[in-house]
């Protein structure tokens, strides 16, 4: 969509290919619109016609525009906020059968598609980028071209009735249809803005002579921070790449990089959707924008990239707590990327162990091997921590003349003795734990002490000692608001990890006692890094302790009686303020949210005469969360 009533047609699919026709299917039960279309592709065995389908959820459709074509046909224009899901049909249905499963559905013959292109293996040769300029005449950018136009047959009375039925059914689901006979359509080519931006360096499969296609007079040079923020606005839909002109690019290029970046950050922060990019400068003057003014020493600006099956989305640099690697290479922090693989619109994780997602797995493989291209930079895979692994993420790095990914990994430590792939990745991720370095102390005095073992069991696995003096320094450096000094700290120090217990009798002055079980690898980094401190918590039972107590002879009835008593207390707390205050102050959380909620109840925000909606709803949320913890972790008091 170029505007409210304007659309650029990038690729038309017309008529019939090898007796395979276009078809639309409306499924009211699953609330989705499906369009089937054929495409001719080239494979190793020759050329063939592949059947595709695009599935559009009703939740992705807000408004439909109905127009009339020059030959009096009805056309439906469907603009989508996010890319729909594309599938291709397997030509060999028998290959989708499996001996391991007893059930088979016809949907299993359809596999997810990440590209619609004539040469199927072409994308695997290039890095993942926002603007894919493949030299393929049948390439359809399904991640960026998110407006679909369907020209419906109106030659017969039956066809016209079916068209009206589609519009009426969509209207029942609050998808309004607006009739616009003045809707404008233009047949366009690739956006002009990419021709004016500085050309990328030649990569594998690309000839250097292609860089001479454009004259130097038409090239607009943008600094990387401005180029990155521009792609943030384009990938998020704040600016339309088809409406960005050379005038707009020249305007931001003539600004200072800081000022140009602020204008683009303003568009992303306000979530603007500008049909005319030149309006950005007027909106900025009228509303203004206040960026992040001060970054604490233990934080840094992190650029995040979300890779979906069909496109890529960039995020404005955000302030986050740093890690050991980011602190070491703070002078080139803009060369780090934190990436995450998700479904479309970040709806969740990509499903694993699903044969229909092979193309999505190939896209992940392409990202890991070929990298991510932003401007003239190509970011390569570096490593991932445990927290990134849980959300399907990783860290990428763009090499410089003096620093490569291998150089960073060598600085992180010696991992050559680790032969298990999973353990190797986990040890690399140990350096990416979010930590706070103890300032003013480059390296504490480290003493190695043995583990305590009895009958083949290690009773001190991962537990070292720290002096009370160092513990006090940590409390002051982290400005902890605590009533009692923490008794233990979760830490990282070089290749060591685990917890350090405050031990005044053994650890003196600046000493840290590390056990052999805490040492995972050798590293040149010796600074003490703290992840979190011990805090007060309410002692409860859990599934593990219940299992142990039952094996020691405690009857199960004892636990069920305690559980019933606690459930009755939660129900009574929704009626009796005294019971609610008692339970809220007894089961407190680290953020002291329960204490604040108890103060609201104590201040008569919930009485027989006054039921303040916010307090009542938060109390219901507290009860639901507590019951969830009882069900999942058996936290019985």
Please report, for each region that a protein language model flagged, where it lies by residue.
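Conserved small-residue
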Residues: 116-637
């Amino acid at each position: 969509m170029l505007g409210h009533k304007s659309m650029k047609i990038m690729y038309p699919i017309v008529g019939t290919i090898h007796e395979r026709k276009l078809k639309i299917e409306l499924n009211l039960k699953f609330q989705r619109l499906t369009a089937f279309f054929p495409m001719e592709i080239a494979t190793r065995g020759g050329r063939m016609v592949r059947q595709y389908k695009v599935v559009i959820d009703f939740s992705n459709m807000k408004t439909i525009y109905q127009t009339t074509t020059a030959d009096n046909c009805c056309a439906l224009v469907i603009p989508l906020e996010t890319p729909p899901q594309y599938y291709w049909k397997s030509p060999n249905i028998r290959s989708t059968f499996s001996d391991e499963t007893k059930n088979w559905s016809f949907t299993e013959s359809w596999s997810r598609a990440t590209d619609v292109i004539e040469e199927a293996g072409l994308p695997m040769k290039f890095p993942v980028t926002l603007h894919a300029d493949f030299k393929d005449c049948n390439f359809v950018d399904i991640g960026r071209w998110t407006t679909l136009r369907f020209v419906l047959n109106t030659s017969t009375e039956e066809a016209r009735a079916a068209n009206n039925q589609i519009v009426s059914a969509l209207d029942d689901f609050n998808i309004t249809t607006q009739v616009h006979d003045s809707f404008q359509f233009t047949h366009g080519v690739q956006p002009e803005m990419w021709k004016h931006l500085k050309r990328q360096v030649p990569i594998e499969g690309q000839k250097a002579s292609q860089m001479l296609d454009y004259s130097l007079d038409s090239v607009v040079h943008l600094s990387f921070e401005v180029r990155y923020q521009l792609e943030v606005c384009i990938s998020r839909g704040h600016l339309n790449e088809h409406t960005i002109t050379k005038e707009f690019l020249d305007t931001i290029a003539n600004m200072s990089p800081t000022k140009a970046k602020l204008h683009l950050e303003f568009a992303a922060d306000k979530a603007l959707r500008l049909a005319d990019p030149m309006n950005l400068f007027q909106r900025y003057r009228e509303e203004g924008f206040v960026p992040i003014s001060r970054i604490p020493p233990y934080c840094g600006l992190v650029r995040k990239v979300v890779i979906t099956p069909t496109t890529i989305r960039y995020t404005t640099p955000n302030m986050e707590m740093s890690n050991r690697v980011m602190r070491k290479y703070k002078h080139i922090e803009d060369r780090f990327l934190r990436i995450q693989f998700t479904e479309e619109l970040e709806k969740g994780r990509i499903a694993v162990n699903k044969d229909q997602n092979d193309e999505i797995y190939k896209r992940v493989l392409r990202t890991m091997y070929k990298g991510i291209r932003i401007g003239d930079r190509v970011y390569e895979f570096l490593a991932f921590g445990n927290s990134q692994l849980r959300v399907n993420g990783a860290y990428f790095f763009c090499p410089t003349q003096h620093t490569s990914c291998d150089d960073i990994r060598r600085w992180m430590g010696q991992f050559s003795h680790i032969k298990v792939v999973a353990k190797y990745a986990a040890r690399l991720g140990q350096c990416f734990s979010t930590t706070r370095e103890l300032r003013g102390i480059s390296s504490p005095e480290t003493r190695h002490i043995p583990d305590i073992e009895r009958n083949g069991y290690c009773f001190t696995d991962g537990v070292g000692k720290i002096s009370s003096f160092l513990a006090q320094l940590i409390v002051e450096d982290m400005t902890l608001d605590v009533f009692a000094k923490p008794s233990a700290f979760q830490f990282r120090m070089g290749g060591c990890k685990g917890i350090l217990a405050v031990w005044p009798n053994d650890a003196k002055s600046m000493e840290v006692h590390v056990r052999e079980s805490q040492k995972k690898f050798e590293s040149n980094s010796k600074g003490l890094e703290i992840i979190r401190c011990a805090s007060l918590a309410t002692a409860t039972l859990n599934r593990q302790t219940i299992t142990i107590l039952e094996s020691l002879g405690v009857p199960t009835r004892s636990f069920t009686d305690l559980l019933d008593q606690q459930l009755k207390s939660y129900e009574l707390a929704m009626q009796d303020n005294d019971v609610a205050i008692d339970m809220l102050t007894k089961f407190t959380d680290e953020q002291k949210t329960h204490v604040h909620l108890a103060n609201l109840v104590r201040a008569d925000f919930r009485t027989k005469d006054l039921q303040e909606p916010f307090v009542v709803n938060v109390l219901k949320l507290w009860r639901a969360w507590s019951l969830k913890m009882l069900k999942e972790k058996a936290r019985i008091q």
